[in-house]
Structures are given as C-alpha cells and as structure tokens.
Amino acid sequence: MGEEGPPSLEYIQAKDLFPPKELVKEEENLQVPFTVLQGEGVEFLGRAADALIAISNYRLHIKFKDSVINVPLRMIDSVESRDMFQLHISCKDSKVVRCHFSTFKQCQEWLSRLSRATARPAKPEDLFAFAYHAWCLGLTEEDQHTHLCQPGEHIRCRQEAELARMGFDLQNVWRVSHINSNYKLCPSYPQKLLVPVWITDKELENVASFRSWKRIPVVVYRHLRNGAAIARCSQPEISWWGWRNADDEYLVTSIAKACALDPGTRATGGSLSTGNNDTSEACDADFDSSLTACSGVESTAAPQKLLILDARSYTAAVANRAKGGGCECEEYYPNCEVVFMGMANIHAIRNSFQYLRAVCSQMPDPSNWLSALESTKWLQHLSVMLKAAVLVANTVDREGRPVLVHCSDGWDRTPQIVALAKILLDPYYRTLEGFQVLVESDWLDFGHKFGDRCGHQENVEDQNEQCPVFLQWLDSVHQLLKQFPCLFEFNEAFLVKLVQHTYSCLYGTFLANNPCEREKRNIYKRTCSVWALLRAGNKNFHNFLYTPSSDMVLHPVCHVRALHLWTAVYLPASSPCTLGEENMDLYLSPVAQSQEFSGRSLDRLPKTRSMDDLLSACDTSSPLTRTSSDPNLNNHCQEVRVGLEPWHSNPEGSETSFVDSGVGGPQQTVGEVGLPPPLPSSQKDYLSNKPFKSHKSCSPSYKLLNTAVPREMKSNTSDPEIKVLEETKGPAPDPSAQDELGRTLDGIGEPPEHCPETEAVSALSKVISNKCDGVCNFPESSQNSPTGTPQQAQPDSMLGVPSKCVLDHSLSTVCNPPSAACQTPLDPSTDFLNQDPSGSVASISHQEQLSSVPDLTHGEEDIGKRGNNRNGQLLENPRFGKMPLELVRKPISQSQISEFSFLGSNWDSFQGMVTSFPSGEATPRRLLSYGCCSKRPNSKQMRATGPCFGGQWAQREGVKSPVCSSHSNGHCTGPGGKNQMWLSSHPKQVSSTKPVPLNCPSPVPPLYLDDDGLPFPTDVIQHRLRQIEAGYKQEVEQLRRQVRELQMRLDIRHCCAPPAEPPMDYEDDFTCLKESDGSDTEDFGSDHSEDCLSEASWEPVDKKETEVTRWVPDHMASHCYNCDCEFWLAKRRHHCRNCGNVFCAGCCHLKLPIPDQQLYDPVLVCNSCYEHIQVSRARELMSQQLKKPIATASS
C-alpha cells in the first residue's frame, strides 16, 4: 500500500462539488461575450444567423449586432422551432425571444441544447443557486463573498420583531403556540403560530383536522390604532355532508373577542393621526372608551362582527364541497359575516397570462392593441385583487373589525389579499425592509408553492400547477406605486429585480414549496439570499420621492381604467429611452444645460469644442481644424453609434488586429472596443493645430507658484491632459515640446477672475504642508517599459502640488479633476478602432495614430527615470493623511458602491473600485458593463453604476484597465457632466483601453449589469432625481471646500504676515510725559493706548479654544458623515473627538492628541480632522521657527 495521508475529504472545497463543464465551441476563435458569475460556466458557444449565442449553467446569452438578450435559463418557459430556422423562446415573465439560424440542422441542435438546459431539474443541486453559493464561499478571505449570501438581521429575527412592533399583548390576550415546531402539524405553516391565549394546543389539533391541509386560522397582523386583526387560513372541509367543528367555530369567534380585549391606541386615548378616518367617528370611539376605561378589561364592549372574506366566488366555493371543501355558514359561526370576492383560480390566471404574453409578442404597433389587451383580462384580475385588499383594509381601519381571509388552500389568493391589505394599512411594509419582511412572512413562511408555481420544482412535469401568482401580486404593488409615488421607499427597479429572481434560481429565497422543505434541504445555508442584492442600503432601489414620515392608509382607485400595463416587465423594449442613451438634453435646453453643469460653481470654466466630427479627427487624411467654442458637446455626436460588437464577432468576418507595442513588448490582441470618447476641450486643443493661450499672465500669483513647485514637478504641470499622458505610461512630450506648449497656451482664454490670488495661496499652503514628499506611485504595465520594469509617473492632481490645472479651474475642481484624468491616453500599445457612420469598422494603425499627434513620442525614457525614482513614496490625501498608496487604492465596500448609482458626474464619495476576471478564466472576455455596475469584491468582478468602461476588453496576461486617478474625493468628471471610470484590481499591470463614447446616444441598448449579471432596470425619472440629489450634495460639498479654503487662506495670511515690531519697554517715556507739568497727553499712557500698541502682536485665538465640541447623538446619525454609508450591525458608529460628527470605521480610525480639547492622550479623530490637526501643528512649528531669529535679533 502507498503512503497514508489525511482523509481526502479535508481537501474538498464546496465549489469542487460543482465543477465547470467543458466548453463546446462551434468555432475555435469565438470568445465568451460576457463576464460569468461565481460558479457559472459556459457550456455551448456558437453563431446564429445574425448573432452570437451562448448557453451557460445559468443563462442564455444572445449577442445581436444592435442588442443583447440575457435571460436566466429558469426564466425560460418553453422553447420551440418555428419556420424551420427560428427558435421561439417564451419566458415566464412574458418576454419572447426569437433567434434565427442559417441551417435547419443548426437550429435543431440548439433547440435540443436549450431544451435540455431548461428541463425540470432531477435534484435540487441541479439549480444554479447551489453552485453559485458554493463558489462564493472560498477558503481564503479574499475569495469570500458572504455579503452576497446572507440577508439582513431584520429577516432573521422578523417574527419576534413583528410581534413587538404591532403591539400584541402576549401576557393577557395572545400567545405564541409552538404546536408546529419541527413542522409536525402543518409543513406549509411557520413553526410559531399566534392564537388567542385561551386556545389550547389540543383544540388547535382538532381544528387542523377540519381545515384543508391543516392550515388553521392564525393571526398575522394587528392594527395599532384600533386593535383589529387580520387572520388567514384555508377552506373548511364541510363536504356534501355539511360537517361542523365546534373547536373551529370557537377559534374563529375567539379571534374577534381577543381583538376587543386588546384595543389599540384609539380606545386607550392614544394618537388619532393615522389614516384618512372620519374625525367624528374617531372622537366617538374615544368617548366610548373613556366611559369604560375605569371598569377594566372585563367591561369591554361586545366584540365587533368578524368578516370572513372568501376569495372565491360563491359558485366555486359551493362546488368545492364536492371535493371535500366548502365555506363557512353564518348560522354556525356567530357574530361573523361571510363575503365572496369572486377571484379567479390559478388556471384562469395562467391562461390570462399566456394571452398577455401572446399580445405583448405581437408587432410593435398592432391596430387592435387595446382590445387585445382587454381580452386577456389581466387588468381585470388585478382590479378584483385590489378591491379585495381595499375591502380588508377598510374593514380593519375604518370599521375596526377583524378579518379572516382564505381561499381554497390558502397559499395563492390568500397571501395576495393579506399582503396587499397590509401594505395599504401599514407604512412599514412600504419600506424596503418592511417589504422584505412582508414577502418572507406572508409568502414564504405560509407556504406559497414557489417551486410548483414558478416551474423549478424537481421531478414535476405537471404544467397545470404553474401560475404567475406572485408576479400578479407584484404587478398590483406596482399599480399602488404608480398611484402613490411618494409613499413607497422602493422604486420600480426593486420590483423588476424581484420578478427576475423569482424565476432565475440564482438565489435560494424562492426555492422549494414551503419552509419545511427549505429546512430539510438546508437551502438557507446552501444558497444566497435575494435580499443581499435588494438590501435596504442599496441606493439603486431607493425611491427619491419617498416621504418617510407619512403614515397614511392607502385607498387606491381599483377601476380597470386606472390601471396600467407593467411595461418594464411585459414590454421592456418599449421604453422610450435607456439611461445609456439619455443625457441632460432630455431634461434641459442647451442654455439650461450649460447653466446646470457650468453654473453650479461660479468659477468653473465652460467646456469647449475643438472639432466638429471626432470620427474624422482620427482620420489622418483630413487635417485637424479648430472650430468655434461650444459648451454643448453632446449635440455634436448624435449620429455616432456605440460599437458593442466583441472583437471576436466582427460581422464582416475581419481578422483580429494585432498591434505592435512599439517598445519590444509582446503583441496583444485588441478587440473592437467601440469609438473613442469625446475629448475634453484642453485635450482637443492639444491635438489641434491651433496654438494655446497662456495662463502665466492671468495673475502675479503664478510666479509665486512657480517658485514653490520643484523643477521636477513643474515639468509635469503644463497642462492637465499632458499630465495625464505622463501618468498613464503613454509617451510624453520632451521638454522642448513642453516649453513650446507653455509658450502657446494663450489659445484657451480665461478671464482674470479665474485665477484669483486665493488659488495661489491655497496651492502654496498645500506645497508647504506636503513638502513635496507625497508622490503617487501610478501603476504601469511592465511590457511597455523599455527596461521591463514598471514605469511610474506622478499624478500631481492627487497631491497637494499646484499646477496649471489648478489655475485653469476653480477651487472646487481641485477635488474634482477634469475629465482628462479619466481619458485614455494615446498609447502605442493600443490599437485604436474607429467606426464610420455607415457601420464599417476600420482599424487605425499605430503609425497613423502618432502621425496625427506630433511630439508625443519623445521623452519616454525620461518618464521612466522619473517614475522609477518615486517608488515607495507616500500619498498625501486630504481625507487620509499620509499613507502608502496601496492603502488608498483599495476596493470599496458593497454599501459604498450602491451610493454611486446613476449619479452622473456627482459621485461625491469614491475611493477606488476593482475590476478583474474570475480565477480560472483563461481567455480574454469582454465586460459588457456600459452603464451599470456589478461587483465581485476582493479580486473578483466589480462594476459600478453609471457609465463604466473598465473592462471593455482585457487579456489575462497583463492587459488590464487603467486606473483613474483623482484627488481627495476620487471621482472623475467627464465631458458633459458624465462619469467614466477605469478600474483595476492589479495596480502593477495596467494598459490603456479605448472606451465607448459617453454622451453619444446609441441605438444599441446598453447593458447595466448588476451583481446578478442581468441588465439593470432603467427609470429616467429616478435617474434624474438622483442627479438632482447628487447635484445638491456636490454644491454642499463645494461650499464646504470653499469654507475650508477660506479658513486656510486666513490662517496662512496670519502665518505669512510680516512679524510685528519687537516689543520694547516704553513705560518710562510715558511716565515722564505723564509727570511733566502742563502735559496734554495724560491719557496717552492709559490702558487703552497700551492695548492699541500691543494689538498687532497678539496671536489670533481660535474660537474652538473657547468652545466645547458637542457630539452628534447616535440616533440622529443613520449614515456616515463622510462616505454616507449606512450604519448597521456590522458597520458601527464612531465619533470624532475633534468635530463631534459620526463616521464609520473607515473614515474615523486615526488617533491624535487634541490639546485644544484638553485631550492630551491620542484619541479617535476622523480623517479630515487628522489632516487639519497635522497642518496646524506644522504651521505652529513654522511660526515658532520664524519667531526665534526675531527674538534673537531684538535681544
């Protein structure tokens, strides 16, 4: 026998149970056109007639020339072949996808592949949710993705929290029964059941034998103001024999009695401000309660008549008696009233939805659209559901009566009515957290059969059990959101995502049929939760119109004419504009747009245009000409198409271009990465043949700056765009070219007010505080270095070093560098691809590129020398102080990423994001993250909302996306106020890419990929509201910066003022004058005169020395003062001992003594206060050094 070793099980990881399958390609040169998720593996890849098609274990991806289809496999309802060459794919959310093939054989082959991929699973592990969770959990901390797996604390402790929130009297009136522990009574009910306190478990067992599926009447909601409760159950099993059950009748009437014994705040004289109730009715109830309050609980008035709401029609209820069911008889249930709502069963709803899908898949503009939509009866079914919920809400709120809701089995129409009524009654369920609790408690805990209704239950072939019940309920919530847009914390995108993942099987939330099955299969621990994606801290799903203080009871209009078709789900392609296509021109006129973006700061320079056609600008056959200035850059690129074709799927069949790096590096395959972005004004001026205007004459403070900046740094500060070329390893101009540019800078033309003395003083103060020692190590690609070592340049904008960029812009743009900081440099290792308006793709060679941009290839060796001498330097950032660059360039958290959703140019808190490719990916893949963002933290894929081109294409062997460097707040503003970011998780391997233009509308619908790998739902209204909010935050931040700059300017003025005259003793002279006879200057030596003489030598006293820092209370701070991340159990609050504000641990982790606060030991301070204290100490030391020679000379 061989050597004995440890058991092999110790070496098995969870992801090893789900190994990726081998990829089958129809052509060897094809590459996967999307970025896979954790555990996702592409199994088939080939070409259709006009598209690229791929099937993974999670999704079907079809890349057309002008669109992309991205559908999870479990969302596909049926696949069939039509017209011999066409695949007709029907989805469970009513979408219909058609894909054409060139041959009948190929069509049948892909039909067979897709049919096998979408077949019912043989075992639960065949669902992708298990593989996704296993691959999200790695052995190392870097591979952990637990934030994608676990729900929040409000989900785990929802039952206890709900009982406390609704104010149940668990001592005298109600009790929590554990009769269903381990699901021994009813597998489709939760383990804890709320019943009246005098109902015993034996009676509950007897009632369970009388109710269908043992689903007994239990209470699920209590109205806080009047104590009325909502209960739910299934139908009674009366059958044709007319069976009765005394315990069931007693339990139903006991619910009404318990509500009378546990009145709400109205009966006890509490607040009456909730809802739209009649004032006289509230006063009468309060008066009646005051008469009986002294006599105790026993003297409470008779219980209200309980309403039994049967969701079925009376005919259907009676017909169910033949199957052993039935309905309650009012004669047997005293003090009860039975009402039938006439809601259709699941078979009618399924047929209606199929008709709706057929209507939505017709031609875009059918002549009979309205009549066809009416014939589906989908809106009619929604109307009946809303009417039932409104009846329950009015009965509870206005009449104060308890309600018992049931249908046949109690797991389809019953949760629809109960959950919708709770949304109408309780504003908590209209919040993000409350809505999640509502879905968990009323749908999942009470056994809605998601596995059967959604069609992903294993070994079930009966299609009659499939029905979009939950989708229909979400549609009704969408109708409420349309009618009450200010009363819901979540937006439409939240509901659309919930629809997608009800069927996607990416998360385990909606797997299995009841909680008993989920617990037996350990689904909660083996799969991720959808609430991790739809968490409350994700600002992508926040409704910016939400009014949190409103507690109004909703009374919606339920008529069919007031309802709307949910186009975001049923007709997603009908939306008039996507976020990738829309820009500020949709909302603002050209004049208003200019004022919106350039007028927020009085000293911001307007953006100018240097060429009419960016496409012809890249053509060397046409000379570069300068045109008149125009601040509206977006208006001149309307006809440009965004090239979204991957490099491997050129429709013309052109070969992949190989470009020589120019410095002896290996050749790299470059894909079709679209058109070059619109260049900012200064970069266009640099590329044009016209000279620049000089800034040196705008203010005498420029000379002061020149004297303060070291010579080595002054060579890098001639222009923002030139500086960026030097930062990102592109060939830099030689010193002679820079001198020429410096002599010809007069073309820009800036008013004198744009170069105030404050900028010089501010920049000088930064030079003094930095001592020119905080240098940023910018990552470079080793293959572009002549010596094979990484080159590093110095981005001045990340230091406190002044440059002409500071003079070109206002004080506010010191922290918001121009878009050139994000523009891709002209790099010899990048093949620039251009596409003319007709759609043909042309490749511009390396030599043609450089010929149109003269004097850019000189001085590369000089850059390499300067870059290599800066290794190991520290980065001095106003937010973090001095620290190694690696600590600053770090991936941000998931909660921080959610802050940047569709904020345009106003991303006010950004420290760094990471984009890489999953481990094991051996081939370059195109990251279709045009506008939105998905993230895989810790060396996995991360995408940020907004235009993000960080991974348009990449090579595993060193081709990464360039890092976007910026100053303190770290965001980069592109032309027209849009953002562009390039992200990399490997700072030492960076290469340039050519992004797609940001502001050019495209007929190609872009992909907004989220954490789930699916397109992000677009909402132009919420997008505009985010822009408005972000603009407000930016204005506030600019005002804060201006205040800080003004304070620093005043401090420097006091610090740099000439020293006062040394104090001398004039007391003898004054005494002589005072004692002399006939002196008229007797008052000259008074105390007032002495004060006037010595006033100039007084040191300024800071107000903080006489004030006590008051801390912001914990309950008033829900978000970090700096990064605006939300506090929760794992993100605690930290007070800064200097300013008193509340921060998270990342923004408040440094310690310093604060003598001004009598804190002589190091205490916790925020990053900004840390820097301020450090600067103040350095200024005090400098002042002391200046006073020493003066005191020596005077002595």
From Swiss-Prot:
Residues 780-795, 831-854 have a biased composition (Polar residues). Keywords: Coiled coil, Cytoplasmic vesicle, Endosome, Hydrolase, Membrane, Metal-binding, Phosphoprotein, Ubl conjugation, Zinc, Zinc-finger. A 1,2-diacyl-sn-glycero-3-phospho-(1D-myo-inositol-3-phosphate) binds at N320, N345, I346, S408, D409, G410, W411, D412, R413, R453. The active site is at C407. A motif (PY-motif) lies at residues 1004-1008. The keyword Transcription regulation does not apply. InterPro entries: MTMR4_FYVE (IPR046978), MTMR4_PH-GRAM (IPR035997), MTMR4_PTP (IPR030590), Myotubularin (IPR030564), Myotubularin-like_Pase_dom (IPR010569), Prot-tyrosine_phosphatase-like (IPR029021), Tyr_Pase_AS (IPR016130), Tyr_Pase_dom (IPR000387). Zn(2+) 1 binds at C1120, C1123, C1144, C1147. A 1,2-diacyl-sn-glycero-3-phospho-(1D-myo-inositol-3,5-bisphosphate) binds at N320, N345, I346, S408, D409, G410, W411, D412, R413, K449, R453. Residues 645-756, 780-800, 827-877 are annotated as: Disordered. GO terms for cellular component: cytoplasm; cytosol; early endosome membrane; early phagosome membrane; endosome membrane; extracellular space; late endosome membrane; membrane. It catalyses: a 1,2-diacyl-sn-glycero-3-phospho-(1D-myo-inositol-3-phosphate) + H2O = a 1,2-diacyl-sn-glycero-3-phospho-(1D-myo-inositol) + phosphate; a 1,2-diacyl-sn-glycero-3-phospho-(1D-myo-inositol-3,5-bisphosphate) + H2O = a 1,2-diacyl-sn-glycero-3-phospho-(1D-myo-inositol-5-phosphate) + phosphate; 1,2-dioctanoyl-sn-glycero-3-phospho-(1-D-myo-inositol-3-phosphate) + H2O = 1,2-dioctanoyl-sn-glycero-3-phospho-(1D-myo-inositol) + phosphate; 1,2-dioctanoyl-sn-glycero-3-phospho-(1D-myo-inositol-3,5-bisphosphate) + H2O = 1,2-dioctanoyl-sn-glycero-3-phospho-(1D-myo-inositol-5-phosphate) + phosphate. The phosphatidylinositol-3-phosphate phosphatase activity is inhibited by vanadate. This is Phosphatidylinositol-3,5-bisphosphate 3-phosphatase MTMR4. It comes from Homo sapiens (Human). The lineage of its organism: Eukaryota, Metazoa, Chordata, Craniata, Vertebrata. The gene is MTMR4.
